[in-house]
């Protein structure tokens, strides 16, 4: 007798909203999902704020969502931990942060603060940058420079001017710091090995090459004049007397204050790896600190806030129970179904196979809303035919990645393609008397319009997400669940007792 696979299908960025305006989820033609919502038990889950270990009212995101789902418990996020340490004062005693500042003071070298200057709270927070400036001032550092990456995805697309202005006012007030470069996150924070983008950011940081401006505010307005919003600001060097304010040089200290790893890794590698093949560059000798651990294999890097260890995540526990599992996603979300789902552990568990499907090489995903969903689907259907896996974790990236473009019609098409794909997968699993749980990690494409301004919205939302139980067995689901309740539910269906570390509760009544 063949296996009865249990699949968790994560529709990334697929939230629930009753409002029709800008709701690509509601507008999409999705006969399969509509049928499942009528036929099968379903509920809604909290996927933002306190429900996922973030500050109240803070939108969820993919890293946080997958961490909470995989851990089966509320995972208190780096944003919360770092903010708390600033408020309570431990931040200013952090040995690793202090060592970077001390290195600059002792050697009379520069202290460079790199990161996303945004209160979005997904990759970084401006309050953490302000905390670093306070620390530098306390320690007597005088040569402190900010390399500002502009957002436009987790906040409105043209809001950088406001955040840069706020930072320039703070610099004036505290009497320390200068903005040296401005780069859109499209360049500085690529995560898909598009090294030609990262190279432009690197050239601005290290060689002072790129667009030129007399101030950070001017860099932003120049970009707007050229029709480029915050995410796409071409790396720009701020000049004084026709010379760069500064560049990153041998002997300097660098603190990369992004706390989310996935979009900080590539630039960190370019600045630190002994052997680097992304593009031609000279290896610098730096005191380089990252706010959190971006990747255990990074060379020449010190970590200020180490990751917490989560014992008995879903993947680890299922492996201990001698069950086999498959993780599958396209490049954009591969780290989420592997590294983040496993509690920040890179190595696969025993009997955990992985399928990485390359994401399409397009400038922005509105140009190809289907992304690689059909390739993911055909691969997982082939794997199901092998009758090998007890559990499959699958992520469809489209609703999130296309939702981030702010282009409604593209997001609608993205959801329609995902609906077509998931219909094929669900049919196959039901044929095998298996179970499919359909959920999301956070909202996005259900709100493509900023209700207050009418402008396109590119950020995540605080909306709840669906949880569908698609199976030939009938059951009832409870209300008021959170993402941490998904793993205990999966274990119950697999006939496994949940480990004591999982504090989430099964959603089955």
Curated annotation (Swiss-Prot):
Single GO BP term: glycolytic process
Quaternary organization: Monomer.
Function text: Catalyzes the interconversion of 2-phosphoglycerate and 3-phosphoglycerate.
The keyword Transmembrane appears for this protein: no
Enzyme class: isomerase
Reactions the enzyme catalyzes: (2R)-2-phosphoglycerate = (2R)-3-phosphoglycerate
Protein family membership: Belongs to the BPG-independent phosphoglycerate mutase family.
Protein residues bound to substrate: 123, 153-154, 185, 191, 260-263, 333
Taxonomic placement: Bacteria, Bacillati, Bacillota, Clostridia, Eubacteriales
Annotated positions binding Mn(2+) 1: 400, 404, 460
EC identifiers of the protein: 5.4.2.12
Organism of provenance: Clostridium kluyveri (strain ATCC 8527 / DSM 555 / NBRC 12016 / NCIMB 10680 / K1)
Pathway: Carbohydrate degradation; glycolysis; pyruvate from D-glyceraldehyde 3-phosphate: step 3/5
Gene Ontology MF terms in the entry: manganese ion binding; phosphoglycerate mutase activity
Family annotation (InterPro entries): Alkaline_phosphatase_core_sf (IPR017850), BPG-indep_PGM_N (IPR011258), Metalloenzyme (IPR006124), PGAM_B_sf (IPR036646), Pgm_bpd_ind (IPR005995)
Cofactor: Mn(2+)
Name recorded for this polypeptide: 2,3-bisphosphoglycerate-independent phosphoglycerate mutase
Underlying gene: gpmI
Gene3D superfamilies referenced in this protein's UniProt entry, alphabetically: Alkaline Phosphatase, subunit A, BPG-independent phosphoglycerate mutase, domain B
Catalytic residues, chain numbering: 62
């Amino acid at each position: 007798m063949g296996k009865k696979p249990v699949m968790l299908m994560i529709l990334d960025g697929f939230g629930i909203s009753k409002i029709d305006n800008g709701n690509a989820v509601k507008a999409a033609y999705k006969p399969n999902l509509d049928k499942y919502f009528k036929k099968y038990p379903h509920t809604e889950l909290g996927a933002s704020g306190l429900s996922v270990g973030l500050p109240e009212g803070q939108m969820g995101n993919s890293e946080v969502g997958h961490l909470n789902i995989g851990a089966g418990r509320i995972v208190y996020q780096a944003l919360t931990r770092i903010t708390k340490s600033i408020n309570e004062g431990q931040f200013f005693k952090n040995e690793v942060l202090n060592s970077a500042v001390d290195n600059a003071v002792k050697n009379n070298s520069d202290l460079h603060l790199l990161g996303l200057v945004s209160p979005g709270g997904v990759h970084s927070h401006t309050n953490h940058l302000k905390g670093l400036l306070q620390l530098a001032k306390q320690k007597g550092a005088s040569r402190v420079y900010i390399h500002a990456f502009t957002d436009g995805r987790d906040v409105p697309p043209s809001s950088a001017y406001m955040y840069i202005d706020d930072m320039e006012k703070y610099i004036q007030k505290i009497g320390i710091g200068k903005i040296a470069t401005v780069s859109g996150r499209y360049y500085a924070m690529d995560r898909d090995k598009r090294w030609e983008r990262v190279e432009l950011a690197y050239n601005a940081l290290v060689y002072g090459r790129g667009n030129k401006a007399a101030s950070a505010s001017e860099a932003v307005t120049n970009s707007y004049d050229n029709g480029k919003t915050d995410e796409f600001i071409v790396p720009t060097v701020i000049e004084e007397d026709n010379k760069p304010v500064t560049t990153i040089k041998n002997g300097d200290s660098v603190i990369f204050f992004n706390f989310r790893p996935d979009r900080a890794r590539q630039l960190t590698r370019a600045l630190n790896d002994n052997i680097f093949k992304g593009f031609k560059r000279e290896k610098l000798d730096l005191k380089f600190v990252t706010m959190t651990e971006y990747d255990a294999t990074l060379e020449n890097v010190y970590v200020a806030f180490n990751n917490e260890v989560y014992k008995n995540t879903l993947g680890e526990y299922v492996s201990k129970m001698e069950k086999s599992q498959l993780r599958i996603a396209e490049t954009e979300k591969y780290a989420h179904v592997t590294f983040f789902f496993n509690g920040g552990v890179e190595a696969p568990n025993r009997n955990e196979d992985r399928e990485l499907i390359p994401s399409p090489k397009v400038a922005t995903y509105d140009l190809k809303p289907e992304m690689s969903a059909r390739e993911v689907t055909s691969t997982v259907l082939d794997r199901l035919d092998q009758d090998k896996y007890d559990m499959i974790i699958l992520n469809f990236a489209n609703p999130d990645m296309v939702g981030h473009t702010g282009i409604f019609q593209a997001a609608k098409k993205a959801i329609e393609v995902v609906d077509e794909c998931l219909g094929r997968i669900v049919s196959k699993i039901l044929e095998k008397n298996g179970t499919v749980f359909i959920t999301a990690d956070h909202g996005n494409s259900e709100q493509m319009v900023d209700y207050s301004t009418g402008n396109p919205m590119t950020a995540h939302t605080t909306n709840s997400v669906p949880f569908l139980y698609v199976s030939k067995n009938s059951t009832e689901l409870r209300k008021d669940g959170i993402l941490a309740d998904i793993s205990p539910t999966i274990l119950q269906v697999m006939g496994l007792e949940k480990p004591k570390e999982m504090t989430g509760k099964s959603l089955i009544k």
